[in-house]
Amino acid sequence: DIQMTQTPSSLSASLGDRVSISCRASQDLSQYLFWYQQKPGQPPKLLIYRVSRLTNGVPDRFSGSGSGTDFTLTIDPMEEDDTATYFCQQSRLIPRTFGGGTKLEIKR
């Protein structure tokens, strides 16, 4: 299985900050990297597919970058509604494994 290592596991940022979340795969993913946002009591929402392509309706404050084994989700600027847990997922090989998640909170 492909192992997905996501950092940091938790993050506190101020409104308006630029936030970056990293994901590293144990082998080359080509373009098969997705990012999800999950809020408490809700199913995960697909934000970004194929590394950098935004799903319809996702604001362009969100962006994805990277290639090969190293990928980044960036939120700029952070807004209150962005408080959630974020996951990367690879779809290069089955099983389609996830990173451990990053819980993003607002620094008050």
UniProtKB/Swiss-Prot annotation:
Stretch list, region Framework-2: 35-49
Annotated spans, Complementarity-determining-3: 89-97
Region described as Complementarity-determining-1: 24-34
Chain segments carrying region Framework-4: 98-108
Region (Framework-3): 57-88
PANTHER family xrefs: IMMUNOGLOBULIN LIGHT CHAIN (PTHR23267)
This protein's name: Ig kappa chain V-V regions
